[in-house]
Amino acid sequence: MILLGVTQSDTTEQAIWLAKKCCELRIFSDEQDKMNLSLFDVDGEAMIVSNFTLYADCKKGRRPAYVRAARPEQADGLYLRFVEEIRSLGIKNVQTGEFGADMQVSITNDG
């Protein structure tokens, strides 16, 4: 599961870099239970969901502000570019959420 937040200063180049980084991060366990394998190594799949709340600012008051999150037009384009790049890198099964939709997503963290 990749929860992708986009901020106002993000660029296409950064989206491409991040997609590659996500695929290359060694976050999966090997035979010795050491985090030593990447998404490529485990022939993994990806579920990518856009999430502007990752840029919530909770410093003032009791209601989060989302002023650092990119406008929907910019965020949607970078989200789609990120997804396209993950696919082009050879990840076979890439699922996506619907940009801007109110979705219920369940995650089970391991570790």
Each model region followed by its residue ranges:
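Short Lys/Arg-rich amphipathic alpha-helical segments
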Residues: 1-48, 54-60, 66-80, 85
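Short, loop-centered acidic/histidine patches that primarily coordinate divalent metals
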Residues: 51-52, 108
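Positively charged, low-complexity, intrinsically disordered RNA-binding extensions
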Residues: 66-111
